[in-house]
Amino acid sequence: PTIQFIVEEAKASGIEDILIVTGKNKRAIENHFDSNPELEQDLEKTGKAGLLKLTQEITDLGVNLYYTRQPHPAGLGDAVYRARSFVAGEPFVIMLGDDLMKDKVPLTKQLINDYDKTHASTIAVMKVPHKEVSKYGVIAPDGNIAPDLYNVKNFVEKPAVDKAPSDLAIIGRYLLTPEIFDILEHQKPGRGGEIQLTDAIDTMNKTQRVFAHVFKGERFDVGNKEGYLETSIQYGLTHPETRDALRKYIKELGEKL
């Protein structure tokens, strides 16, 4: 599952304590990271060393995993607010499970590096086709302080194409200071009747700096069927255990189309 890649990115970025906010019928996420002694014994007995190693790596990531529930889907802002006691007054990172990122340096680590220099909240953005801006929160940039780091005039949640302030869309990585929780506590429902994180960040930007980091790596959106299939193929083509067979299959399939 994609949550595996999210946790691995967090670990590679130096994060040790991870809170996963789940919803109804999401127990499979918790089960995924639980140890399974019976399965491991069976794999060992049947000589499936490769699968045994993979199973053990999943459950022994070297990070501390915690879980909390969002009983009702009330928006991303509501989900983030449920992490308030866990964050305990520290800067923190939000990683959305629908977005997988690939780059030489993990995107989360890039945001942490920015924070080390600015000590300010930083949002990951990426240039998208203008016709697609209405799918995202979008920033209005206000000059840059580094090649990939912009000041932000304001944030707009899913603007109409003709009213979008830029083509720089917010993607699923945020580094925020804990002041965001005071804002979320009083945030009124926005688009769709939900508590929008983008609205809260826009409010925070009026009293303290919020920067936007332009991501130049690869982003995979697994939040829809087409994106999930494309991501599976892309990852399959780079994984040593599947790439050769998958390339062969795609070539054979291409000849039939």
Model-derived segments and their meaning:
Residues A12, D34, S85-A88, N113-A120, ...:
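Generic secondary-structure signature for well-ordered alpha-helical cores
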